[in-house]
Design a protein with these regions (language model features):
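Active-site metal-coordination/substrate-binding segment of hydrolases
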Residues: 90-157
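Generic secondary-structure signature for well-ordered alpha-helical cores
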Residues: 25, 36, 62-63, 148-151, ...
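Midchain, well-structured core segments that form catalytic/ion-binding scaffolds
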Residues: 172, 180-249
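Acidic/histidine-rich catalytic neighborhood of metal-dependent amide-processing enzymes
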Residues: 130-205
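N-terminal helical capping/dimerization or prosegment-like subdomains
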Residues: 11-107
Length: 249
């Protein structure tokens, strides 16, 4: 990206490791404080929890060094916006994440409370520990490190939504309404995966979602198969053919 200055990789690795070691207990507690909030977007009874989680993210973003952070309304669950300004001419990175999680049911399959983080063999078990409170926390702490150590060379914006797990029904309208606020040079998505635990991966693209309702209409009365079979298309056969051809081989 034009205008970005990169620091020495070996120095950064040592410095980051030291920062993590010095702040590990705090990092974990802040992460766990988010996990403990049952921000299940598919459950309409969790509206209060959704707002509480958004407010918690706002607080953590300000603590990490954002110039401003706010919880913004939408037609559904609120979104969290924050930014750190370095310079008018500096490139801007927009970091996307989501604070909502999937339902934890069936609860009898869990060995521990899904909303009370439990560490077993060096791994954290809880709903949202990974998707997406874990990845978003990594981005937040990387941002915090860059700010506090004086390494930040570009403007940073955060946007966290609360409906990703239900298809982001309110996101498009929000983006259109606030397109100037969210203007950026590049977007970093905090909701991807690694090929293996010891193999960090750079994801350059994700598949989206698309929904259709298809209606196939045929004759308005029963037709004798001996007279019309094969000559008049059966709506079921037509629909099967359509579905089979929707995949691009």
């Amino acid at each position: 990206m034009q205008g970005v200055k990169f620091l020495n990789g070996k120095y950064m690795a040592k410095s980051v490791k030291k920062y993590i070691e010095e702040n590990e207990a705090r990092f974990l507690e802040e992460w766990f404080s988010l996990i403990r909030i049952p921000s299940v977007s598919a459950d309409p009874t969790r509206k209060t929890d959704m707002v509480a989680c958004a407010e918690r993210w706002k607080h953590l973003l300000l603590e990490a060094g954002a110039d401003e952070a706010r919880v913004m309304p939408s037609s559904g669950n609120p979104l969290v916006y924050a930014e750190k300004r370095v310079g008018f001419d500096a490139p801007t990175v927009l970091i996307y994440g989501h604070y909502d999680v999937m339902p934890a049911e069936p609860l009898d399959l869990w060995k521990s409370d899904p909303f009370e983080p439990e560490v077993r063999d060096g791994h954290v078990f809880a709903r949202g520990a990974d998707d997406d409170k874990g990845q978003s926390m990594i981005q937040l702490k990387a941002f915090e490190y860059m700010v506090r150590e004086g390494h930040l060379r570009h403007n940073v914006k955060f946007i966290l939504e609360g409906e990703e797990e239900i298809g982001s029904p309110s996101l498009n309208a929000f983006l259109q309404e606030h397109r100037e606020l969210l203007a950026c040079d590049v977007i970093l998505v905090s909701d991807t995966s690694m090929l293996a635990p010891d193999l960090p991966s750079l994801t350059t693209g994700l598949r989206g979602l698309a929904y259709w309702e298809i209606e196939v209409t045929g004759p308005n009365r029963d037709l004798h198969s001996g007279h019309f079979g094969g000559a008049v298309a059966n709506p079921i056969n037509v629909l099967c053919s359509l579905l089979a051809r929707m995949t691009d081989e």
